[in-house]
Design a protein with these regions (language model features):
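Positively charged, low-complexity intrinsically disordered leader regions
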Residues: 1-57, 61
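Active-site cofactor/substrate anionic-group-binding motifs, chiefly glycine-
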Residues: 43-44, 48-96
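Glycine-rich phosphate/diphosphate-binding loop of Rossmann-like nucleotide-binding domains
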Residues: 49-61, 143-221
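Short, structured coil segments at secondary-structure junctions
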Residues: 66, 96, 116-117, 173, ...
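Anion-binding alpha/beta catalytic cores of soluble intermediary-metabolism enzymes, centered on
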Residues: 98-169, 261
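Rossmann-like adenosine-cofactor binding region
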Residues: 196-274
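Adenosine-phosphate binding glycine-rich loop
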Residues: 256-257, 263-307
Length: 307
């Protein structure tokens, strides 16, 4: 049965938990020099409308480790929705590859691809959400805290696709999620209410970074202006200046709290050099875990496809 990974909401709580366990197994096997050829003779089409370092490397390396092949296409190679319709591209690609992976601006494009493709579609990032990243984050949290349930997470800064990803996750895994941002950059409060109504997580939105961080086990941030928002940088730096993760703010968190950032980071803006390089920072563990979580996602989708 063909299934996709476009949002965390596409999978159940059990499926998410099982996949994290599987990712941990794959990570351990990799460290032992074992790479089970679970994607042998499988080919994946990787589409990039946005520049990429971690996403491209982690997917290409992961697919290769498991015996598969990657075909990478940039925006210069194809014009989905311009030269050809999304539906035509999806149906043609489905005849060539075993999975379509896309990193783009438009979330609707990914949904349209999934609607018409007969092979799994994976959202490598859109302006709306970033499910592979939040899965990697949860593996990192589990490694450091020993569990993922009811973790006290303080998300500090701009409300963006990562904020939405964390809110979606809170609909599947019980979290104590605190979002601290400026009045000008508040998240979609309708979505916040919908997640709260599900009733498994506690969600709080505040304009005080200190309030969000008090007693937190995880401090999380992202860039203040996402890719394609260069015109908003000056405004964001002004309104979000009090939402920087620095050593002063870190003091309000739990003593052994971990600091997370999905990268790339604008050091000195949303997070200081001192904090990103401190002993509590797990930023580069997050980056590594993209590799193993994404391998687990692709293997699971292939298993479902052949059932």
């Amino acid at each position: 049965m063909k299934r996709d990974f476009i949002s965390i909401l596409d999978w159940t709580s059990k499926e998410i938990r099982d996949n994290l366990d599987f990712a941990a197994e794959l990570k351990q096997q990799t460290k032992e020099g074992k790479c089970p050829q679970l994607l042998k003779r499988k080919t994946y089409g990787l589409f990039f409308h946005k520049p990429s370092l971690r996403t491209r490397l982690s997917f290409e390396v992961g697919i290769a480790q498991l015996g598969g092949t990657s075909l990478v296409l940039s925006e210069q190679d194809f014009k989905i929705g311009e030269r050809e319709t999304v539906s035509d591209v999806a149906r043609v690609m489905s005849r060539y590859v075993d999975g379509i992976l896309i990193r783009t601006f438009s979330h609707q494009m990914v949904l349209d691809l999934a609607q018409h493709a007969t092979v799994p579609v994976v959202n490598m990032l859109t302006d709306f959400n970033h499910p592979c990243q939040v899965m990697s984050d949860m593996l990192t949290i589990k490694e450091n805290l020993g569990h993922i349930d009811n973790v006290r997470i303080a998300y500090i800064g701009d409300s963006n696709n990562m904020t939405i990803s964390w809110l979606n996750l809170a609909a599947r895994i019980p979290l104590d999620l605190r979002i601290a941002t400026a009045p000008e950059t508040m998240p979609d409060m309708k979505l916040v209410s919908e997640i709260q109504e599900i009733g498994i997580s506690t969600i709080k939105v505040t304009n005080s970074a200190q309030e969000a961080v008090e007693g937190a086990e995880v401090l999380y941030t992202d860039v203040w202006a996402s890719m394609g928002e260069k015109d908003k940088i000056a405004e964001r730096e002004l309104v979000l200046k009090d939402f920087q993760i620095n050593s002063s703010l870190l003091k309000y968190a739990e003593k052994n709290a971990i600091v997370m950032h999905c990268l790339p980071a604008e050091r000195g803006k949303e997070i200081t050099d001192e904090v990103i390089e401190c002993a509590q920072s797990v930023v580069f563990d997050q980056a590594e875990n993209r590799l193993h979580v994404q391998k687990a996602i692709l293997v699971q989708l292939e298993k479902w496809r052949t059932v």
